[in-house]
Amino acid sequence: YDGIIHNGIIANDAELGNVNGLVDSMILPQVIDRSSLDTIVDSVAKIRGSYAMVIRGDDTAFAVVNYKPLYLLRKDGTIYFSSMERHLSPECLFGERPVPLEPYTAVDLRSGETRSLPRQENNKALVVCSGGLDSTTVAYVLREQGYDVSLLHFLYGCKAEPQEVTTMRHIGKHLNAEVIYQAIDYTSLSGSSPLLTNGHIADGAAGAEFASEWVPARNLVMLAHATAYAEANNFTTIALGNNLEEGGCYPDNEEEFTTLFSKVLDYAVADGRRVRIVTPVGNLMKHEIVALGHRLGVPYELTWSCYRGGEEHCGKCGPCFMRYTAFQRNNLHDPAIRELVV
């Protein structure tokens, strides 16, 4: 319609003036001011619904999307568009591929200039916190950065759950942060993790170098729950304690995992909402995390890392081994572990 190609649904076209129109897209030429990239962004703010649009201007063209996908392929002086990458891929030469427009973005197709569409954002951060060294440090990092921090702890039946619950209460009080508890039922899984059964827990370096205690899809499940809670309770940021050291043995601690999950979030929450994942210690090893937390005054004496339950850290399992070693490398005393016994 008048130089505008639209894929999606305009839910408020009648309110915008398309009272008797059968096709919602017919209202767009009246709504879209194509004078500049900024006026495009201002115009689409009036629309309630979904859209991936290509808009012809006087001497250029614009593309703008919310969550509807749009792929671009430049070939022989022509720009091809599609909502699916596979429609354009056969046209690509070796080494080429269609380029996706980032969700909630407008672009001037001649100059390449882009704008991000405004979304609902705030400084509320939901830290997925086990009460261990890494995620507790993350909570204090975000507080230092000015976030309004709340702690989300999952009850999934691990052996150290009673100790973790106590730890979370103390950390929340020290941080002056709300602590939210959510239960996840793993009891129906057969052949499950040693953390959930009476299976063997590896000790020392063996426990630190391989994911013997892997809980099936734990971080994926927890992130799905955290995303739902964040959206429902108006949190823009979800923070994780994923780090470089544990990425070596846990696939869901790899940076690529959080990068890919972050891409899903634009399609997992309501239109106009933003929920993002941050990993403030994602590029750090354990000893670097301890050094950072020490500077910030993190109360490591309150934290719990041990896979085994009990009144004290066992000093044997992989997490005990890793944290004790991390403190040693900083010439610091680990306030939670007297000594290693491996």
What do the predicted segments below correspond to?
Residues 1-121:
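Conserved short alpha-helical segments that host acidic/polar catalytic motifs at enzyme active sites
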Residues 23-27, 48, 217, 221, ...:
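Conserved active-site and cofactor/substrate-binding residues in soluble primary-metabolism enzymes
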Residues 29, 227, 262, 321-324:
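Short, amphipathic alpha-helical segments that act as regulatory/interfacial helices
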Residues 40, 95, 298-305:
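Short, surface-exposed acidic
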Residues 67, 237, 242, 304, ...:
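Short secondary-structure boundary segments
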Residues 121-296:
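ATP-dependent adenylation/nucleotidyltransferase module used to activate substrates
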Residues 224, 302-325:
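Local cysteine-cluster metal-coordination motifs and their immediate loop/turn environment
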Residues 309-310, 331-342:
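Short cysteine/histidine-rich metal-coordination sites, predominantly Zn2+-binding motifs
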